[in-house]
Structure formats: structure tokens, C-alpha cells
Amino acid sequence: MNTVQKAIELILHKGLRKYKSKNSKAGLVSIANQEKFESKVLNGKKNKKGSIFITRKKEDLRAKFGTRGVVLSSEEAVLDHVGQASHWTPNVYNFGTYGQNGLRTIVGHTEKNLQQINCFVIDIDSKSFPMTAINDVALNAGFGVPTMILETTKGYQVYYVLDKAVYVSNNKNFIAIKSAKRISQNLREMFADSLPNVDLTCNHFGFFRMPSVQNIVMFFEENVYTFKELQEWSKRQDDNKGNEQFHNVIESPFAKNAPVEQPKQMDELWFKQVISCTNVSPKQTKAGRNNAIFTLSLACFQSQYAIKDTMDLMDQFNSNLEQPLEHTEVRGIVMSAYSGKYQAAHKDYIERLLQTYGMGQASAFRAPSVLWKKHKKQRKDRVRSHWHEWEADIITFLSMNSNNKPVLYFTQSELCEALNVPRSTLNTVLKKSTKIYKTVEGKGKTAKTGLSTLGMLIAFALKENGKRRESYLNYLQGLFPKTGNILEQAKTSNVMEEQETLYGILEGLPAG
């Protein structure tokens, strides 16, 4: 079984039939035995199988007549489409069918038709950092390394796979979906705190890149998560944010960045045009309902409008839509806009909304072009920061500048200047940190400090083969004992596909 097949079967959690009902390549005996098994009642419940959806190319997701694709109801059919399909729904639906217009328009990929939730996917539209930074962000946040990372045209998609599927029912008003959405949103925000262009508004259970031989850059088969542990982690994240929805954003400690001092966007013509629109389409990926509400909420944030009042305003806007969102989803979008990661609505997104719905252009737009972008707190505002905050900065700096090298070398002066950190603080951080690997070359003023992170070292080790790889990983397990499970999996993993030439033997690691 190859890596792609392992990944797909792991994600689907037996939510589809094993074999195709027609034209299967499997033997008759295998098909008969499998059908007998699938017809059994397990734990008092029917062994129900569902469907997923795929599209041949990205453009099919936003076709004028609806999403164009194929409905698949067996693992065999899914594997037949590997390399041919661009996107899929990794979470399984109860059924799928086609529209009546004869253009292979697919129908059924809605939340209330979800059968089971298999995984959470984070979409990052940037390659301005090495892939290892994703693992470093997760580890630095006290969370686990992803199950799988796919490389896309513009960036990466990060998969966190559940150890077993969470089944959806309409009991208690689809409570599993609500809980899963909070987990998904908190995962996105965790990465958005450190990495650029994390998509915070795309459908949590929609279409994502389908795994293929070409796009899998990391896969740890055993690195799966229980829904319960993710729920507990998500609740802690929500508790840390505080009960911000009842405070004015300027007074709330939840806001890390104050709104920009510009003319209020709520007073501009485009805001009045967008908020009056009722035909915002759910099928528009870049100018749909989520993006409209997010853009309007950011304008409210920039205008120093209280978050409670923004909630009411967006609820009213949503209710006026021809196809409104759920109230809980609107609330989540507003909270993301008020999270402090952004300062105002961005011109590009405003223009896209106006052009899509025929309202002209935002000619009176005044906001700076750098907005709708995460802004870190200025160092001058963090003079008395704790050592672990400096540690996070160093890890981010190393990850962003690694260029797939296992170790980066600096003099202490160079590092202090790059991070604007006092030398005494730097020494304290490097002494206390269990997440940064340090080695020193030379003596005195000419000495250079080599620094690395676990993500950088794992990526380097996985480039090697056989005993050399095992030797490196055993050494890393000694350096970072808490990550033993991940490193054990890495010893047999061969899916880190690197295009660059292998680097020389890492100083300080055994020669193997």
C-alpha cells in the first residue's frame, strides 16, 4: 500500500463502501465478503456508508451554474481518481447526487447532510516560509504536529486527522458540527498568530486539495487526535480569549492591535452598498457570505464600533440574505474580525465584493494597503516580555529563515540585532529553552552560535535513508524526549519529498 492510499484510507475512516458497485477491479469473492461485512449491524447501528465529492480542477468549484464535480461512494473509486482530481471533501456526506441541468453540477455538500467528520484542514496561501515552520508553530503552541501536510500552488494545506470519525446527527441541533467548528476555527487562529495568509473564513467542511504523489510533503500515519482532546484544547483557547463579545473593542484586552487611525470605513459608500446587498452567493469562494460578513466586521472594528453592536448588525445583514448562514457561524466570523490580528478591511476584498455584485468600485476607499493582515505587537511594547515570548520569537525567526537548512549560524551580536533582544535575555532564553537546539563553533569574539528547531531537524533527518536516518532520529529523541512518538513514526516515513540537494552531515549529530 503506497503513501497516498494510506493517507486516503486513514482520513475516510471507512465512511464509504470498500469497492465500486459496478466495474470493480476486485475479485468476486472479495466483493461478496466485503458486502456481507458492510451489511452487518455494528453496536446496534446499521453500518451506514456515505459519499464524498471531487472536482477535476479548481475552476470547477466556482462554475456559474454551481459546483461541477463527481460523486463518489467507494474507496476504490476515490483511489481511481488520485492524480486526476484536484479537490475533494475529506469529510463524508450522507448522500450525493447531481443537479438537473445536465452539467454534472453536484448537490448535497451541505452541513446538514454531513454523515461524519474525519479531519480538520487549515489552508495557508503563502510560501514565504519553509514547511518546517508549520511544525514549529504547532509544537511551540503546545499542540501536536499535523498528520499530513500537502503543498499547493500558493502554499500548504495542513491536515489534523481524528483517530475515529465523529458521526453527525440532528439530535441536540447538530451539536457535533458546532463543536467541530470551534475546534477548526481555533486551529486556524493558532497558525494565523505566527504564519501569514491563513484562511480564517473558508468552509470548515468543504473542499480541500486531494492527496497525491506530487503534493504530499509530510505524512505521519499514527499522529491522529481524539475528538475529546481537541474539544478540551479548544475550550482552553476560548477561555484564554475571554468573554470579549460584551466589551467595546478599544477597552477589551482581547484586541492585540488597536484600529488604525483613519476615516471610519463604516461611513464610506462601499460599506453602505455591501450591507444593503441581499443576493450574496454561497457559491462564491472569494466574494461569498463569509467574506462579506468578515469584510463588514473589519470595517466596524476599524471604526471603533463595539463588538456587541457589530454582532447585532451582522445578524441583521445575514437575516436579509436570500441564503443566510447559521447564527453561530456569523458570531464566529465577527469574533475573528475582532481578534486583534487585523486592523481594517482590505481594498482588494472590498473591490471584489463590489465587482461581483455589480455595485461599481470603492473609489472613495481610504484604508492603507497593508491592512487585512496580521500585525505583531511592536517590540517597543514588549520591553518586559517573559522569556518564553522571546523563545517564540526566536523559533519563528529560525523557521522563517531556515531555507530548509538544519542549522543556522550567527554571532550573538548578529542574533541580538536581528531580534532586537538584549544579550542577557538571549542567553537566558537559550539556557532555559527545551525547544531550541544550540551548538557553538569557535571561541571568543569569532565564536558562532548554531541554532535549530525540532521541525528543522526532523526535516533534515528525513532526507536521509536507512541507518543514517535512524541514527539522527535516535539522537533527536534524546534531545527532545517528549516527541518520541513522532520521531518513532519518522523512522519509517519516506514521504518527505524535498527537491533541494541534501545538505552535509549536521554538526553535533552522530556520523551514523
UniProtKB/Swiss-Prot annotation:
Signal peptide: none
GO molecular function: DNA binding
Keyword Nucleotide-binding in annotation: no
Entry keyword set: DNA replication, DNA-binding, Plasmid
BP term (GO), one: DNA replication
Pfam families assigned to the protein according to its UniProt record, in alphabetical order: PriCT_1 (PF08708)
UniProt xrefs under InterPro entries: PriCT_1
Function text: Essential for replication. Binds specifically to a 60-bp region corresponding to the putative origin of replication of pXO2. Also binds nonspecifically to single-stranded DNA with lower affinity.
Name recorded for this polypeptide: Replication initiation protein
Gene: repS
